[in-house]
């Protein structure tokens, strides 16, 4: 079933439930003929088609679980409430917690943090919004809460090295060494299925049991973040089961995990370079780039920007390559 989605043309996300203009629930999946072109997508396609039966039975998607939302509307007072103490107690008693951050990509300034867990089939969590508005006391309190959780229970991140761990250290001073254990969902899935995408949207299509929320980044940022937390929980539970059936892959994953602190430290230090060799090379290659640009302008007849989509337009639209 292909969805007649209105608006800008985009590649449909596998397993996305959307609504057309006539308000008909539609499940967007790969066309079966596409498997002749891309056979490696057979398993994801099978899982998507299997959702039809679950949908008709009312088993999918499941209702979105509740979470405690803490924000500036009430001065973040819930950080000190009795409900928070109960949440932390249940979090540290879970098998693992999933943690997801939302931040400004250029500055890594954190603005939303979500933590969720599955306690015997009951999924719940905590969300703190607009963290830059926290007072010093509130920030210290949130730091203590996060520290209490991560020192007592394994934490699963979607992308520990490339996103969440550096953001948490910048915002709260919480480091890799403060964790009981760090698990990386993207890394684990890459060990299992190297030929597939490893982004959270794809993983939600493969393992998710809740409505898609990846499209809510601007409409409802809080629900978008909570959706990432829920999808991380579901995907990690699925990946753990798959690794249990393939012990060599589990061993490879455990070995790869040992690189996380090394990579974090190397990202801080950067690369050591021989300036005496690099600086002259920069001048040489800059001259080559300028020459190439002038040649492109002369050939195209206009000041084409080789670093943007204009090159694609020139080659495929005008030259018809």
Regions found by a protein language model. Name each.
Residues 120-156:
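Nucleic-acid-processing active sites and adjacent nucleic-acid-binding tracks
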Residues 1, 98, 153-164:
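Acidic beta-strand-to-loop metal/phosphate-binding motif
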Residues 30, 99, 158, 183, ...:
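Active-site flanking residues adjacent to catalytic metal/cofactor-binding acidic residues
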Residues 106, 113, 161-175, 186, ...:
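Short active-site loop/helix that positions an aromatic residue
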Residues 26-29, 96, 123-128, 155, ...:
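Conserved beta-strand scaffold positions in the cores of enzyme catalytic domains, especially
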Residues 51-131, 220, 225-321:
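Conserved "right-hand" nucleotidyltransferase catalytic core of DNA-directed polymerases
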Residues 1-66:
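Glycine/proline-rich loop-helix segments at beta-alpha junctions forming the active-site rim
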Residues 33-38, 127-140, 180-225, 230:
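Short alpha-helix plus adjacent loop in nuclease-associated cores
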């Amino acid at each position: 079933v292909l969805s007649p989605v209105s608006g800008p043309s985009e590649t449909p996300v596998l397993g996305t439930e959307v609504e057309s203009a006539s308000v008909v629930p539609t499940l967007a999946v790969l066309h079966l003929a596409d498997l002749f072109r891309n056979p490696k997508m057979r398993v994801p396609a099978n899982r998507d088609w299997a959702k039809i039966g679950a949908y008709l039975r009312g088993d999918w998607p499941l209702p979105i679980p509740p979470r405690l939302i803490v924000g500036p509307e009430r001065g973040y007072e819930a950080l000190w409430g009795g409900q928070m103490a109960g949440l932390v107690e249940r979090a540290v008693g879970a098998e693992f917690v999933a943690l997801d951050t939302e931040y400004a990509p250029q500055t890594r300034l954190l603005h939303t943090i979500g933590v969720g867990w599955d306690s015997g089939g009951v999924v719940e969590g905590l969300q703190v919004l607009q963290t830059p508005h926290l007072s010093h006391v509130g920030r210290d309190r949130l730091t203590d809460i996060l520290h209490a959780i991560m020192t007592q229970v394994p934490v699963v991140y979607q992308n520990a090295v490339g996103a969440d761990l550096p953001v948490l250290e910048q915002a709260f001073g919480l480091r890799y060494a403060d964790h009981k254990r760090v698990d990386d969902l993207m890394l684990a899935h890459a060990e299992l299925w190297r030929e597939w995408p490893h982004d959270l949207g794809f993983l939600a299509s493969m393992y998710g049991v809740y409505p898609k929320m990846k499209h809510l980044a601007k409409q409802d940022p809080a629900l978008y973040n909570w959706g990432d937390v829920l999808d991380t929980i579901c995907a990690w539970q699925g990946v753990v089961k798959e690794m249990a059936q393939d012990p060599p892959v589990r061993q490879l994953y455990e070995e790869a995990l040992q690189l996380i602190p090394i990579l974090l430290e190397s990202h801080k230090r950067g690369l050591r370079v021989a300036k005496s060799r690099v600086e002259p090379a920069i001048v040489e290659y800059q001259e080559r780039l300028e020459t190439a640009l002038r040649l492109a302008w002369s050939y195209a007849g206009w000041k084409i920007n080789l670093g943007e989509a204009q090159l694609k337009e020139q080659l495929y639209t005008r030259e018809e390559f």
